[in-house]
């Protein structure tokens, strides 16, 4: 029974720590950062494939290869 009680106490402690951290996190002011330009800067819509060894399979829907990545309808990034 000692093992069960210590396991239960450890579980309660973990739940308490998580609750306190989540409560503190919701009260903290978090800056909203727009990361869309960091991951896809002015490149239009990514077609979801690379064209390192073979050309874009999605060329039928208007994708083209630039810098080893397929893009569609956007400003193609500089190399």
UniProtKB/Swiss-Prot annotation:
Note the coiled coil stretches, chain numbering.
Answer: none
Q: Which InterPro entries match?
A: Cyclotide, Cyclotide_bracelet_CS, Cyclotide_sf
Top-rank taxon of the source lineage equals Eukaryota
**Listed PROSITE patterns:** CYCLOTIDE, CYCLOTIDE_BRACELET
Pfam family example for this protein? Cyclotide
Q: Name one GO biological process term.
A: defense response
**Crosslinked positions (Cyclopeptide (Gly-Asn)):** 44-73
Tissue-wise expression = Expressed in midvein, lamina and periphery of leaves (at protein level).
What does the UniProt keyword field contain? Answer: Disulfide bond, Knottin, Plant defense
Concerning PTM, the database record says: This is a cyclic peptide.
Disulfide bonds, paired cysteine numbers: 47-63, 51-65, 56-70
Propeptide stretches are 1-43, 74-79
For this chain, the family text in UniProt reads: Belongs to the cyclotide family. Bracelet subfamily.
Role this protein plays: Probably participates in a plant defense mechanism.
Report the domain remarks. The presence of a 'disulfide through disulfide knot' structurally defines this protein as a knottin.
What this protein is called in its record is Cyclotide phyb-A
């Amino acid at each position: 029974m000692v093992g069960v009680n210590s396991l239960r106490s450890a579980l309660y402690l973990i739940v308490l720590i998580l609750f306190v951290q989540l409560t503190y996190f919701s009260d903290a002011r978090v800056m909203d950062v727009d990361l869309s330009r960091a991951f896809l800067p002015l490149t239009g819509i990514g077609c979801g494939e690379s064209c390192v060894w073979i050309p874009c399979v999605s060329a039928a829907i208007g994708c083209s290869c630039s810098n080893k990545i397929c893009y569609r309808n956007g400003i193609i990034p500089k190399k």
